[in-house]
Structures are given as structure tokens and as C-alpha cells.
């Protein structure tokens, strides 16, 4: 990625108190206020594909609000000042129809495609996981072909349909496979756990080419081995990261629609991401934050921190 020459910095907490100032992610400049942009952060406030507890439409703003907590100037784990070596900006939200899923998917695809024509990469704030389909379509256009998909989630999200509907949030990667949006020999799920509707869920998923790192393997193998497996799987391919916040244990992320116990810790999450430094990241999403079920902003803060980690990965890609 070609880095912008003179990035506009976020508002510093040493100059304006963190509870004040712009309401953009990490108090970054808005996209319209920068001449060029390497990474754009964009909200996708859509949750009409939710199968259980709704409310992820409020995720983007809650993540932005929680990002005020962050000190973002320098990240010692990457040894980088992410907002000095690249221009990162907040692109606002993609407007989408909450009453028509098909139309909303088209609107998200158009919005993300237009954005990727202007910037190097995007980090999307969900919204439910349905949004991954149009976002992957846009990433494919940017990449001129399918991408390596690494999907962090408690759930596979490869159902065929749910109550006959093709686009609820449990189906995006079935639809993506049907459209050849990801490389079936370079993609994987990470953090999968819990019971399934059928043993065929696993068989079907394997037929799509996914490799699975189950959540229990973090305890048996450790972070370094997990990172090695992911990097070996991705290789030099263009990478799309899709992160469902319910990959985290509800103790760390209660504010989500379909929580599953025995999940990853926030420490495990950020350490895995840090281990992926150097991969060819082109786009990412962080989805399923539903702040109505949160307390003390802990889920939104976890999501905001993950987004900040992703900006550092872009800086090192």
C-alpha cells in the first residue's frame, strides 16, 4: 500500500480531553477532509439479518464512542505510529435499507466498492454478519479476484438458508463460496465452538474448503502455533479479515446478539492479530456488536481496540 505523505493526525488526548472533540473513530479526520487516504473506517449499521437478539445496527456508533478511550499515537507491540505512516480517516456510514435485505446488500456493495476505488483498504464496523457478502464482493473487485478469508467467529456462518431466507447472518460464507469470493485453499475459521444443528454443518463447511481452528485449540496449541497455522494458510494472498465479536467469550463481550460461552479472551484475540503482522491485508470487518446488551462499554471497547489493532496491521502490510 502506498502511504500518504503527510497524514492528518487524530485529535490528541493531550490537547483535547478524550471525552470531547470529534465523534469519529479515534477522533480521526473525516474522509472528506483529507486529500488522499490509505485506510478508511466505515460504518455499516445494518442488522436485518439477525436471527436472535437484534441491535447490531447501533454497533458502529458505539464502537466509535468507545474508541475515545484509546491512546492511539504509538503501538509498542508493532513499534509503529499507525496514523503517522498512513492516512486513516472515518468515512461515516453506508446508508442501507433496513426493510429490504436484497436492496441493502446492493447498497452496501456499491458503497464499499466506491470507497475502495478511493482508498487503499477499508475497515467496516457492523452491523450483523450479513454485511460480509457485499463487502467481500467489493474486496474482490479491488483485488481483481478472490481473496484469502480468515473468519474469527464462534459460528461457522455457512448455513444454506434460515426459514427459507438466503441472507441471514448465519449464511454469508455459503453465499460467498457460491460466488467464488474467497480462495478455498487459503481460507479458514478461527474460534469456532459450541453445539451445531447437525453434524452435516461441519461436513458442508469442509466441502467449501475451510480449515477450522476450534477455540479449544488455543489452550492445547497456544498462540504461536495458531498464528503459524493462519500465516501458512494465507501465504502471500490478499487477505480479508472478518471478525465477529462473539468469537470472544461473553465475559469479555456480552454485548452481542448470539453469545457462546467458552470463547477467546481479549488477550488471545489481540495477540493473534499482532502475530499476523506482515500479511497482505486489504480489507476487514468487525461485526455483531449490539450495545443494548453490553455493560460499561466493555464489548464496544473490545471492538474498538480490535479496529485499532487492524489499523496497525495495515501500517505493517
Which residues does each PLM region occupy?
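Conserved alpha-helical scaffold segments that buttress catalytic/binding sites
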Residues: 2-317
Amino acid at each position: 500500500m502506498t502511504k500518504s505523505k503527510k497524514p492528518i493526525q487524530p485529535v490528541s488526548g493531550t490537547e483535547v480531553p478524550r471525552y470531547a472533540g470529534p465523534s469519529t473513530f479515534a477522533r480521526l479526520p473525516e474522509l472528506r477532509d483529507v486529500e488522499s487516504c490509505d485506510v478508511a473506517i466505515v460504518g455499516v449499521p445494518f442488522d436485518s439479518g439477525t436471527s436472535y437478539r437484534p441491535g447490531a445496527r447501533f454497533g458502529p456508533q458505539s464502537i466509535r464512542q468507545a474508541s475515545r478511550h484509546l491512546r492511539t499515537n504509538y503501538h509498542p507491540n508493532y513499534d509503529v505510529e499507525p496514523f503517522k505512516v498512513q492516512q486513516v480517516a472515518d468515512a461515516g456510514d453506508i446508508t442501507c435499507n433496513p426493510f429490504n435485505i436484497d436492496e441493502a446488500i446492493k447498497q452496501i456493495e456499491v458503497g464499499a466498492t466506491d470507497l475502495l476505488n478511493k482508498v487503499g483498504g477499508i475497515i467496516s464496523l457492523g452491523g450483523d454478519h450479513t454485511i460480509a457478502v457485499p463487502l467481500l464482493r467489493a474486496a474482490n473487485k479491488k483485488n481483481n479476484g478472490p481473496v484469502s478469508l480468515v473468519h474469527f467467529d464462534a459460528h461457522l456462518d455457512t448455513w444454506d438458508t434460515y426459514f427459507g431466507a438466503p441472507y441471514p447472518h448465519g449464511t454469508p460464507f455459503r453465499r460467498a463460496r457460491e460466488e467464488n469470493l474467497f480462495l478455498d485453499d487459503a481460507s479458514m475459521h478461527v474460534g469456532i465452538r459450541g453445539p451445531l444443528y447437525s453434524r452435516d454443518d461441519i461436513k458442508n463447511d469442509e466441502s467449501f474448503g475451510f480449515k477450522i481452528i476450534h477455540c479449544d485449540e488455543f489452550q492445547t496449541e497456544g498462540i504461536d502455533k495458531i498464528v503459524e497455522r493462519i500465516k501458512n494458510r494465507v501465504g502471500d494472498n490478499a487477505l480479508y479479515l472478518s471478525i465477529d465479536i462473539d468469537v470472544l467469550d461473553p465475559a469479555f463481550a456480552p454485548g452481542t446478539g448470539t453469545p457462546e460461552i467458552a470463547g477467546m479472551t481479549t488477550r488471545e484475540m489481540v495477540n493473534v492479530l499482532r502475530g499476523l503482522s506482515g500479511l497482505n491485508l486489504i480489507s476487514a470487518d468487525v461485526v455483531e456488536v449490539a450495545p443494548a446488551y453490553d455493560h460499561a462499554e466493555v464489548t464496544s471497547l473490545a471492538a474498538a481496540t480490535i479496529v485499532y489493532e487492524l489499523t496497525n496491521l495495515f501500517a505493517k502490510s
